[in-house]
């Protein structure tokens, strides 16, 4: 017997740690606990058979059977707290580690039953950041789908007509909404789901998380930041390209060159043992020494004011970080490198690729061309 357990009570559809531990996808909350290395699910009658067939855990218990046990002991109705109490008493558990997102009311009720609860800091499963070969394969597949979706709309932008300072297609202004919808439809055809996909032009692109709206401008950069999830594997890809239809200004051309160079700095530095903070600082320094400064100007942040990258997997943003905080990279992690420059008089430039940290450096998993000007 072990006197301690891990516990997550959530819906795996919304909790990547829970899905990672169980490989069971469900929209409603269920109980996962790990005792002495043994993974256990407690499932409703609706899901118990599917969980036994699909999950990767060691044991699947019936919620209704545990409730029946509680009723024999005079406990009725028996909810999650009472069911866990029966299970933990049977197995000698006294201490429980939970994630920071654990429901407060349930935590209070378990403490009232005499259990000692503590929060296990993220990463809840430290091994999750180092990807197994099958996880890397899943990310590669999501990347290929993403690149195809990006290519489909880059061709549309390249074929658009320049009318004044706007792009037109088939007699109508070409809008962020039309491009986003086209990408989402392409992704759906490949069993991927795109949400909040960024198609931002003009000064909208100076806000890195603005998804973009309205007509797209000629001669200004258009940021395409695409981060779909595979509905088959549940793994994400995350790729950004910046394109322009028309004639870029000299400032935009310089910004694009510097961002590409910043990416190359990241590619060369990323390897096992590298500090994500040092990678980020090297790119910041490259921009600064070339005269592209970061700070607030007339009430708006301009320059390079976000992190260089983040881990990628079952979540779009997960450990490790490549930014302003020390984080040592390990072989097998998948990270993004996505420097950017943003100025209201020129627009936004961001280029993002996904990298696998290898034994002696990194492999760039995303291969889509990095070209600013598209079309004739």
Regions found by a protein language model. Give the residues of each.
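Active-site neighborhoods and metal-handling regions in enzymes and metal-associated proteins
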Residues: 1-376
């Amino acid at each position: 017997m072990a006197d301690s357990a891990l516990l997550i009570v959530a819906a795996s559809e919304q909790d990547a740690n829970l899905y990672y531990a169980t490989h069971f996808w469900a929209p409603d909350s269920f109980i996962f606990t790990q005792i002495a290395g043994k993974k256990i699910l407690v499932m409703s009658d609706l899901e118990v058979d599917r969980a036994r067939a699909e999950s990767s855990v060691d044991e699947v218990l019936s919620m209704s059977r545990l409730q029946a046990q509680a009723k024999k002991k005079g406990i009725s109705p028996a909810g999650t707290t009472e069911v866990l109490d029966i299970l933990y008493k049977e197995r000698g558990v006294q201490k429980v580690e939970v994630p920071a997102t654990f429901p407060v009311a349930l935590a209070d009720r378990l403490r009232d039953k005499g259990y000692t609860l503590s929060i296990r800091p993220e990463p809840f499963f430290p091994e999750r950041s180092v990807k197994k070969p099958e996880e890397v394969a899943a990310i590669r597949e999501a990347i290929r789908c993403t690149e195809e979706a990006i290519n489909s709309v880059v061709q549309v932008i390249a074929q658009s007509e320049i009318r004044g300072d706007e792009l037109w297609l088939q007699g109508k202004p070409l809008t962020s909404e039309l491009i986003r919808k086209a990408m989402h439809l392409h992704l759906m055809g490949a069993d991927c789901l795109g949400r909040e996909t960024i198609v931002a032009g003009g000064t909208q692109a100076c806000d890195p998380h603005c998804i973009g709206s309205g007509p797209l401008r000629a001669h200004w950069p258009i940021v395409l930041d695409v981060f779909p999830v595979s509905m088959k594997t549940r793994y994400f890809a995350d790729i950004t390209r910046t394109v322009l239809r028309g004639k870029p200004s000299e400032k935009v051309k310089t910004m694009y060159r510097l961002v590409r160079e910043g990416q190359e700095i990241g590619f060369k530095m990323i390897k096992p043992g590298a500090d994500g903070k040092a990678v980020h600082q090297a790119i910041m320094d490259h921009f600064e020494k070339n005269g592209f400064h970061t700070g607030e100007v007339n009430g708006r942040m301009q320059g390079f004011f976000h992190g260089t990258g983040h881990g990628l997997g079952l979540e779009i943003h997960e450990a490790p970080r490549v930014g302003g905080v020390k984080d040592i990279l390990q072989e097998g992690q998948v990270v993004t490198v996505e420097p950017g420059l943003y100025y209201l008089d020129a627009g936004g430039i961001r280029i993002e690729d996904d990298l696998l940290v290898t034994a002696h450096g990194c492999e760039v998993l995303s291969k889509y061309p990095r070209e600013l000007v598209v079309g004739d």
